[in-house]
Amino acid sequence: MTKNFIVTLKKNTPDVEAKKFLDSVHHAGGSIVHKFDIIKGYTIKVPDVLHLNKLKEKHNDVIENVEEDKEVHTN
C-alpha cells in the first residue's frame, strides 16, 4: 500500500546529495509529491514501509526527520 511521507533533509545537505536522495526515491518505485521551498524537504510517495526503510538506511547521513503525511486536527 503506497503511503506519503514528509522527509526533511539536514540544513547543510549539499544539493548533489539531495539529488541522490531524490534519485533513490524514484529508483525505489516512489515519486516526489511536493518540494518545500523554505526548508530542504519533500513529500514522497513510496510503495511500502520497506522501501522507506531502505531509503532511510541509504541516506541516513542527510535525513533529519521522516514522518507520515496525514491530516492534522486541532481541538
Curated annotation (Swiss-Prot):
Main location: cytoplasm
Gene3D superfamilies per UniProt: Peptidase S8 propeptide/proteinase inhibitor I9
GO molecular function, one term: serine-type endopeptidase inhibitor activity
GO aspect biological process, one term: protein transport
Alphabetical keyword list: Cytoplasm, Nucleus, Phosphoprotein, Protease inhibitor, Protein transport, Serine protease inhibitor, Transport
GO CC, one annotated term: cytoplasm
Localization per Swiss-Prot or TrEMBL: Cytoplasm; Nucleus
Modification sites for Phosphothreonine: T74
Function per UniProt: Cytosolic inhibitor of vacuolar proteinase B (yscB), probably regulating protease B activity during limited proteolysis. PBI2 is a component of the LMA1 complex, which is involved in the facilitation of vesicle fusion such as homotypic vacuole and ER-derived COPII vesicle fusion with the Golgi.
Extra remark: Originally, 2 inhibitors of protease B, inhibitor I(B)2 and inhibitor I(B)1, have been isolated from commercial baker's yeast, which consists of both S.cerevisiae and S.carlsbergensis. It has been shown that S.cerevisiae only produces inhibitor 2, and S.carlsbergensis only produces inhibitor 1. A sequence for inhibitor 2 can be found in strain S288c (AC P0CT04).
Family: Belongs to the protease inhibitor I9 family.
Subunit structure: Part of the heterodimeric LMA1 complex together with the thioredoxin II/TRX2. LMA1 binds to the ATPase SEC18.
Protein name: Protease B inhibitor 1
Organism (species): Saccharomyces cerevisiae
Native organism taxonomy: Eukaryota, Fungi, Dikarya, Ascomycota, Saccharomycotina
Gene giving rise to this polypeptide: PBI2
